[in-house]
């Protein structure tokens, strides 16, 4: 976990080393306000080297500053034995408390120094490891593996809040799984936006309007707040084909064929030709439907009238009241009977 401490950590002096140090290195190692603290202690591995190769070797931290102008490293008894100039005091970027495990704190370089590439190798803290284990003999050379820092986004938050580091890979995995991830806002990554589900019926539909049917108030421009309200809550739009057409319009007459009675003084109009034929029989007196019951001589101009009449002979009453046990041979008689139940 990354922790950012705005207050410089108290520094403790280490064993002095009598080596001169360039002035430009002192400027580059000034304490910075922000630093990265790696709380996990580094694995300390010590190996015993031959006494012939360890005489004259000086244990010093490795400097990785880009614009360092120090002297080139001098070759020692082995390829790994290198000498680098070190500071007389403890480095400002390294803090080593005596009562806690070693913590390596890295301070970013000054603005004039070119930033390092990623991944980078952190310099091993050899003097801190020696002082921790109580090793003072120059014959033992501690070998500490360098730490490789993976590219993760740094999120600088206030020192009063709990620091949080979110990796890009973890965030992508969480987004694919559908689980919500709490993320603190930072200056280096944009705000996360939630996906909004849009219903298909919310979008306003395009409708063709007839200019002769539109009233003048509808043509007035709508103010922006009203337009936004109409966009969020669209009104019900009736399609032109579903609108009830006027009675006297030519479209209505074309769609609904009107059958008029051609007798003088009769203004009866029917939508079906069969109804017009039955009506014309009232003028002519024709009654083609005759009752077939034995001894019955009744005739009717309409077939439905003959059907109702024939039920008198058979006694069939197909229309039964749901509120009582009475039955009727005609539907209009049943409707009249049910009205009586409603009044009572």
UniProtKB/Swiss-Prot annotation:
Q: Where are the zinc fingers (C2H2-type)?
A: 259-283, 289-313, 319-341
Per the record, what is one GO cellular component? nucleoplasm
Q: What is the effect of changing residue 341 to A/D/E/N/Q/R?
A: Little change in DNA-binding ability
- The short motif 9aaTAD is annotated over 60-68
One of the GO biological process terms: cellular response to peptide
| Residues the record lists as Phosphoserine modifications | 71, 91, 100, 107, 110, 215, 223, 249
Q: Which domain of life is it from?
A: Eukaryota
Q: Where is this cross-link: Glycyl lysine isopeptide (Lys-Gly) (interchain with G-Cter in SUMO2)?
A: 68, 195, 197
Q: Where is the composition biased (Low complexity)?
A: 70-81, 91-107
Give the residue ranges of motif CTBP-binding motif.
61-65
**Subunit details for this protein?**
Monomer.
Please explain the role this protein plays, according to its UniProt record: Binds to the CACCC box of erythroid cell-expressed genes. May play a role in hematopoiesis.
Q: What's the domain remark here?
A: The 9aaTAD motif is a transactivation domain present in a large number of yeast and animal transcription factors. In KLF3, the motif is inactive.
| This protein's name | Krueppel-like factor 3
Q: Which gene encodes it?
A: Klf3
